[in-house]
Amino acid sequence: MDIRRIVLYMALALIGLSLWNAWQIDYPAKQPVEEKTASQLTSDGHLLPQIIPSNAEQPITLKAEEKASSSKQLIQVKTDVLDVDIDLKNGDIVKGLLLDYPLSVEDKNKPFPLLQNQASQRYVANSSLFILDGQTPQSLDFDFTSEKEYYELKSDQNQLIVTLNGKSEDGLDVKKEFVFTKGSYLIEVNYKIANTGNSLWKGYFNTQLLRSSPKEDKSSIFHIGSYTGASFSNPGKNRYQKVSFSDMSKSNLDVDAKGGWIAMQQHYFLSAWVPNADSENKFYTLATDKDYTIGAVSQPITVKPKEDKIVGSKLYIGPEITSVLKGISPSLDLTVDYGILWFLSSLLFSLMKAIYTVVGNWGWSIVLVTVLIKLAFYRLSATSYKSMASMRKLQPKLQALRERYGDDKAKISQATMELYKQEKVNPLGGCLPILIQIPVFIALYWVLLESVELRQAPFIFWINDLASADPYHVLPLIMGATMLIQQKLNPAPADPMQAKVMMFLPILFTGLFWNFPSGLVLYWIVNNTLSILQQWYITRKYSDEKPAKKVVATAK
């Protein structure tokens, strides 16, 4: 049995399995969570967490109300990259369109709706103030007013400030301010609280990302799913921690954090609340029958009579672009989920991006990166192919040993090892070079799967989206053909059954890659093609050298 080929194809299978199995692995250790308790659902639909006030030794027991409502009084804010709707009832952002990212290749004029407040799908960014009425959290509901119903960032403006005005019954004058910046998906959200009353005001600032249960994108051997769910960062303890919707349903997260961030993730896109780096907050999750929430509630805020105070946070609504996320908050770029080999994937993406700036096409960038990787591993691959060539030359002698010893496996094994020693051939010589390359292959896979830059990126001819499957499945068929050619270059197994199994593998991998993103299949085709050329060259060169040496030896 050809052990080298078995190990090789097992390694290839592991690559495929890693793509759909390791995707769901939460590689950091999980934070302890508290048992589920009741939560407070306010009249506007906000969920308030269980909190422990400074003057209480026990957590507050919360009660849930049954109804939630929202107003239809919306204002629209449009920048060069965002189109958002703000509900004047409490000033929640209930719609967020990403203007530079079309919904689909077929509908380029319709922007991708990251946030939306539809009956079928609810995904909104809430922020509010609340107080404690005894031991019960009481949300401060504001019917804000706005000077205009439509705001637009002009081409000659770098910043747009939208101010909502509101008053509370207990003497608070509140201005809720949204600061939009040209070319940015980051929104500053600030509450300017003025205490016009005669008594000390004490309350809390609460931010949330709330979404209804999305359609699950499960992984299988023929499809690679993407992570959709919540996550957070607690500096010094958890750089990046996922919290799946199933985890939320089982128990509530309860984490004290300084700085950090909370987020809702999906393939390519992200929403995140980023508190000030020096602010202390409690991160929490809550789940109802329909909605899942991750939130951050501040430490108590006090405002003396006739004084004012500003509290706020930053909200990101946009694509998962590593360079952008790095500049917003530490570890936020880890939401570009490159898996356990993220450090290697980051290097490969930087190389791809550098090539893209020159060639201007992500497809050709994939091709050139594959060529560079192949060049980097040229010597290792050459060692592997030389081993294959040696094994091919030994096939007649190995077959003669099998015919000579028949069913005596012990003698066949002993004679085979003596033959390897005599001919100075290592049967496993081709395995190690291939195994060393596997982490690089897997890391590049993650880059091609996770990078939003490849979403709807065209290549050539009919390939107009490298992140989607080839609509005509031509690339998977070409990939299968390259695998078949590679097999023809390898030494043929002496066992007929093993030969049939090996012939079936190209069909298996063609099916495996049938619905894979075109960028992944393109990478594999280029890699296989380069491997075929290198193997053919080395095998031919090796075969030409050996007979010459044999003639010289005979002449002597």
Swiss-Prot record:
One of its GO terms (biological process) is protein insertion into membrane. One of its GO terms (cellular component) is plasma membrane. Belongs to the OXA1/ALB3/YidC family. Type 1 subfamily. PANTHER family: CYTOCHROME C OXIDASE ASSEMBLY PROTEIN COX18, MITOCHONDRIAL (PTHR12428:SF65), OXA1 (PTHR12428). Interacts with the Sec translocase complex via SecD. Specifically interacts with transmembrane segments of nascent integral membrane proteins during membrane integration. NCBIfam families: PRK01318.1-3, yidC_nterm, yidC_oxa1_cterm. This is Membrane protein insertase YidC. The lineage of its organism: Bacteria, Pseudomonadati, Pseudomonadota, Gammaproteobacteria, Legionellales. The gene is yidC.
